[in-house]
């Protein structure tokens, strides 16, 4: 039995593949979770756009961890489905729905699979790959941005929920950003020039790091320090036009009303 067990969704290309190649654990058993088999790594076939396949991963993870006697088990949610770029009214409705399944719901559902299966006796950790899109308001990437915001909030909330539960993993969302992956290349090649931020996105893409560099920086940042559930590898945008809230938020301060935090 391997001392380290690592699941990586989307380990077939980009950051996911480089995370597999650069794992710092020499004896690690790498398991790719993807729509297709990888020639070099064990694979579990799961289609993020099809929720009926997600329980295949649940059964696999439960079986592996129920008898796990190694030192650590890690799960990296990295996969991304890029079939619905574009302005909302121009994207095919079925593609848009698939993107919501794949990029918003699936990361949380697959994360839940791992968390629920983890037990005491070994270190466990869940890494949710986020993006600068979590803090950047980029037209044409609505499901992508929504998914990254969801990942970051979910990681922080479930981290707090599991703090008093023995045998549960540490959690961290890693906001990489600035990485020239295959989906980014595709986005740049197919971007509608009439989109408000098209020129900015194209210019930004040419200044990005390679997936190999990004993967190396991610591994350097893990595991996170105690109490940390979000790691960012780059600052957010300075341009107010690319920021959430800012001038788009009106704070009415209605007397007697307050948000309930606890």
Language model feature labels by segment:
Residues 9, 70-81, 103, 128:
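Rossmann-fold scaffold of SDR-type NAD(P)-dependent oxidoreductases
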Residues 39-52:
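Rossmann-fold cofactor-recognition segment
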Residues 89-108, 151:
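Catalytic Tyr-X3-Lys loop
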Residues 125-150, 155-164, 175-179:
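Catalytic loop of short-chain dehydrogenase/reductase
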